[in-house]
From Swiss-Prot:
Source taxon at top rank: Bacteria
Key word Glycoprotein present: no
The EC number(s) this enzyme carries: 3.1.11.6
InterPro entries, per the entry: Exonuc_VII_S, Exonuc_VII_ssu_sf
Lineage, top ranks: Bacteria, Pseudomonadati, Pseudomonadota, Gammaproteobacteria, Enterobacterales
Protein name listed in UniProt: Exodeoxyribonuclease 7 small subunit
NCBIfam families in the cross-refs: PRK00977.1-1, PRK00977.1-4, xseB
GO biological process, one term: DNA catabolic process
Annotated compartments: Cytoplasm
Organism this protein belongs to: Klebsiella pneumoniae subsp. pneumoniae (strain ATCC 700721 / MGH 78578)
Quaternary state and interactors: Heterooligomer composed of large and small subunits.
GO molecular function: exodeoxyribonuclease VII activity
Family: Belongs to the XseB family.
């Protein structure tokens, strides 16, 4: 597992690590301190992933804005 301050190599790597953390937390077998540490790392990974997704969204909007043939509309995620 990467150190707490170490950024994952990619979005996919972070997502995979986050899934493993969720599985370990859901098992209920971790001692409290270890569960808190895992939760903290999970929050960090989720924030990094959200940031990466926002940057990717901005890049897509910029690329689409460069195309004069098709108008663009801001992305709005579906409410779940």
């Amino acid at each position: 597992m990467p150190k707490k301050n170490e950024a994952p190599a990619s979005f996919e790597t972070a997502l995979g690590e986050l899934e493993q953390i969720v599985n370990r937390l859901e098992s209920g077998d971790l001692p409290l301190e270890e569960a808190l540490s895992e939760f903290e790392r999970g929050v960090q990974l989720a924030r990094q992933g959200q940031s990466q997704l926002q940057k990717a969204e901005q890049r897509v909007q910029i690329l689409l804005a460069d195309s004069e043939d098709s108008p663009t509309t801001p992305f709005t995620p579906d409410a779940e």
